[in-house]
């Protein structure tokens, strides 16, 4: 845990349910260590329980179902190095349980639907990430999961997605513009793939963020199309395509990195890593090592895993620079 003299670094991880937040948080824990990182699920700040939302005719995505005043006050208190009595939302019962004491830590992650929604909370966040699954991929994933595992019909699944869509569009999706990085999961362009078994993943990196320099492929600021398949990277049809270049995203100047396709042999990932710069690694092959450490994590064999690890490494770099800055005495 931390003391009031330490710099608490606050990370925001935003996105809809089923977008990969849990896997990303596991990768962050691998980097920072469980003892140094506290994760707060912002569902705990629901002001209405499940029955209350049903009676009021609102979803959990609607700001009216959430207590942003309490969220702001408690996150501000944690960031100042003091403990809080955090409410608990019970996902099994749908009820609000008695609060629990939460101590500050070196890294505090707030994750959920709204970490970048409220301007007051957003101003407290040192680094913000938005995990963005395209509607086409989201539908395909949900169909595969819910039809196979839960026995839902195709019509039920589409109805569930469409019921959430207006609130998602109004309250969740706009947070992308405030994130320092966005990880987008999109349909492949390599072949026609109606089941989304192959993915095109983009890392959108905002320019001009304090202590954050976008990673790049080969030559910073250039536009690069690269097919790394060959003697040093094993690929089966339809292969892998990578892209890097400058762009504009929701009014922000950004650098894009993109991976379309699947990596066949993770041990060979070091070849790709070797051509990426400003990754935040501390030694040669660290990114590949982190991917190999948890081959079982979803997305490890495509751009999802690669960019989640890369963003985690960049967060570690931001953390180190923020804490170093806090230790420098102010000039008289």
From Swiss-Prot:
Induction: By light.
GO molecular function term, any single one: phosphoribulokinase activity
GO CC entries: cytoplasm
Keywords of this entry: ATP-binding, Calvin cycle, Kinase, Nucleotide-binding, Photosynthesis, Transferase
Highest rank taxon of the organism: Bacteria
Pathway as given in its UniProt record: Carbohydrate biosynthesis; Calvin cycle
Enzyme Commission no: 2.7.1.19
Keyword Magnesium listed: no
PROSITE patterns per UniProt: PHOSPHORIBULOKINASE (PS00567)
Similarity-based family: Belongs to the phosphoribulokinase family.
Name of this protein: Phosphoribulokinase
Organism (species): Synechocystis sp. (strain ATCC 27184 / PCC 6803 / Kazusa)
Taxonomic lineage: Bacteria, Bacillati, Cyanobacteriota, Cyanophyceae, Synechococcales
Designated gene of the protein: prk
């Amino acid at each position: 845990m931390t003391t009031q003299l330490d710099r608490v670094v606050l990370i925001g991880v935003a996105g809809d349910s089923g977008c990969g937040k849990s896997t990303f948080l596991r990768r962050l824990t691998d980097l920072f260590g469980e003892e140094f990182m506290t994760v707060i699920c912002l569902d705990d700040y629901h002001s209405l329980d499940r029955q209350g939302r049903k009676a009021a005719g609102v979803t959990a995505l609607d700001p009216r179902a959430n207590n942003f005043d309490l969220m702001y006050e408690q996150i501000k208190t944690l960031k100042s190095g003091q403990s809080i009595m955090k409410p608990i939302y019970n996902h099994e019962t749908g009820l609000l349980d008695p609060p629990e004491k939460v101590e500050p830590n070196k890294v505090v992650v707030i994750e959920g639907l709204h970490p970048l929604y409220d301007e007051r909370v957003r101003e407290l966040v040192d680094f913000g990430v938005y995990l963005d699954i395209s509607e086409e991929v989201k539908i395909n994933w949900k169909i595969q999961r819910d039809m196979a595992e839960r026995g839902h019909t195709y019509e039920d699944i589409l109805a569930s997605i469409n019921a959430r869509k207006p609130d998602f569009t109004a309250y969740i999706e706009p947070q992308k513009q405030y994130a320092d990085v966005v990880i987008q999961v999109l349909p492949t362009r390599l072949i026609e793939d109606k089941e989304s078994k192959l993915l095109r993943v983009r890392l959108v990196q905002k320019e001009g963020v304090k202590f954050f320099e976008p990673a790049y492929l080969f030559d910073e600021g250039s536009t690069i199309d690269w097919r790394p398949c060959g003697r040093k990277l094993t690929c089966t049809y339809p292969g892998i395509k990578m892209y890097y270049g400058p762009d504009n995203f929701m009014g922000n100047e950004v650098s894009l990195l993109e991976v379309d396709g699947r990596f066949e042999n993770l041990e060979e990932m070091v070849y790709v890593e070797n051509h990426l710069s400003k990754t935040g690694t501390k030694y040669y092959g660290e990114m590949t090592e982190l991917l190999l450490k948890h081959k079982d994590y979803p997305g490890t064999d495509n751009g999802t895993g690669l960019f989640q690890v890369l963003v985690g490494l960049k967060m570690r770099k931001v953390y180190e620079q923020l804490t170093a800055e806090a230790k420098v005495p102010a000039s008289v």
